[in-house]
């Protein structure tokens, strides 16, 4: 299970929407959706 599979499962179990998760994490709903559905790869974090 990848990190994104775990995150997707946790979001579903908590009954959260993508909006509720994306905003506090600094992502757009669209970007988060693409990550969770493996449409794109996560960018490396910059220091």
Swiss-Prot record:
Record-annotated membrane-spanning stretches: none
List, alphabetically, the GO terms of the cellular component aspect: cytoplasm; plasma membrane
Where does the protein end up?
Cell membrane; Cytoplasm
Give this protein's Gene Ontology molecular function annotations.
Answer: ATP binding; DNA binding; nicotinamide-nucleotide adenylyltransferase activity; ribosylnicotinamide kinase activity
Q: Which residues form a coiled coil?
A: none
Reaction equation(s) it catalyzes: beta-nicotinamide D-ribonucleotide + ATP + H(+) = diphosphate + NAD(+); beta-nicotinamide D-riboside + ATP = beta-nicotinamide D-ribonucleotide + ADP + H(+)
Query: Which top EC class is given?
Result: transferase
Q: In which pathway does it act?
A: Cofactor biosynthesis; NAD(+) biosynthesis [regulation]; Cofactor biosynthesis; NAD(+) biosynthesis; NAD(+) from nicotinamide D-ribonucleotide: step 1/1
Q: Which EC numbers characterise this protein's activity in its record?
A: 2.7.7.1, 2.7.1.22
Task: Supply the alphabetized keyword list.
Answer: ATP-binding, Cell membrane, Cytoplasm, DNA-binding, Kinase, Membrane, Multifunctional enzyme, NAD, Nucleotide-binding, Pyridine nucleotide biosynthesis, Repressor, Transcription, Transcription regulation, Transferase
> InterPro entries from the xrefs?
Cro/C1-type_HTH, Lambda_DNA-bd_dom_sf
DNA-binding residue intervals: 18-37
Per the record, the GO terms for biological process are:
NAD biosynthetic process
Where would I find the HTH cro/C1-type domain in this sequence? 7-47
What topology does the record note for this protein and the membrane?
Answer: Peripheral membrane protein
User: What's its job?
Assistant: This enzyme has three activities: DNA binding, nicotinamide mononucleotide (NMN) adenylyltransferase and ribosylnicotinamide (RN) kinase. The DNA-binding domain binds to the nadB operator sequence in an NAD- and ATP-dependent manner. As NAD levels increase within the cell, the affinity of NadR for the nadB operator regions of nadA, nadB, and pncB increases, repressing the transcription of these genes. The RN kinase activity catalyzes the phosphorylation of RN to form nicotinamide ribonucleotide.
Name recorded for this polypeptide? Trifunctional NAD biosynthesis/regulator protein NadR
Q: What taxonomic lineage is listed for the species of origin?
A: Bacteria, Pseudomonadati, Pseudomonadota, Gammaproteobacteria, Enterobacterales
């Amino acid at each position: 299970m990848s990190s994104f599979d775990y995150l997707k499962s946790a979001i579903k179990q908590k009954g959260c929407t993508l909006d509720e998760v994306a905003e506090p994490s600094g992502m757009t709903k669209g970007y988060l959706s693409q990550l969770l559905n493996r449409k794109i790869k996560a960018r490396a974090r910059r220091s």
